Structure formats: structure tokens, C-alpha cells
Amino acid sequence: KANREAGFNKERLMDYFVSLGLEEKLYDKRVNEVSGGQRQRIMLAVTALLDKPLLVVDEPTSALDPESCLRVINFFKSLCSKGMTILSVSHDKQFAAGCDKVFTL
């Protein structure tokens, strides 16, 4: 369950859930009660609540369908428009196409 004791803003978390295509009822689910893709998006939402200037993610869309991938891209763009920098490693060409800057190795 999401840590309600750590000062998380539930309203903002629910906004993030909606942005990422997650149902609000997932807030009360345990980790083993959600799919891998849902778990991945929940962790992105919870991590974004920390309001750090830099978010580093590794393969944030690896277990997601194309629609969920697009939601993550738009979610990241929204965070960036509020001043957050996101550094990601990805092999997903759809994800890379949605990024401002791409470095290929």
C-alpha cells in the first residue's frame, strides 16, 4: 500500500494515477495484487511525489503496452514542464522519440 504516513499528497498522487492510466482503486492494493505494468507506473507516480529536481529511470516503459508508454512519455513531459529533469536509459524507440534529447550509444 502507498505510505500514507510519509506526507504523501493523496490528491496529487491520484492526479498522477489518472495521468498514467491507473485506476484510483489501485491505491489500496498490495504489491502482489497488481500487474507488473501497473506496479511500474505506480512507482513512477510515487517517485514523482518526492519533488526532486532530477529523476533517473532505467527502462521506464519496458513492461508497458504502447498506450501506457505514451502515457508515461506525456507524464514525464508534464514533470519536465514543471522544472524536473528526467534522465532515462531505454531501448524503446517510441519512448526515445518522445524525449527532448537523445544520446545513442
Please report, for each region that a protein language model flagged, where it lies by residue.
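Conserved hydrophobic alpha-helix in the ABC-type ATPase nucleotide-binding domain
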Residues: 72-73
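Hydrophobic anchor residue at the start of the ABC signature
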Residues: 44-45
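Helix N-cap at the start of a conserved alpha-helix in ABC-type nucleotide-binding domains
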Residues: 66-68
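Conserved ABC ATPase signature
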Residues: 30-34, 38
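Conserved ABC ATPase "signature" region
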Residues: 8-25
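Catalytic Walker B motif of ABC-type/P-loop ATPase nucleotide-binding domains
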Residues: 55-58
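H-loop/switch region of ABC-family ATPase nucleotide-binding domains
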Residues: 89-91
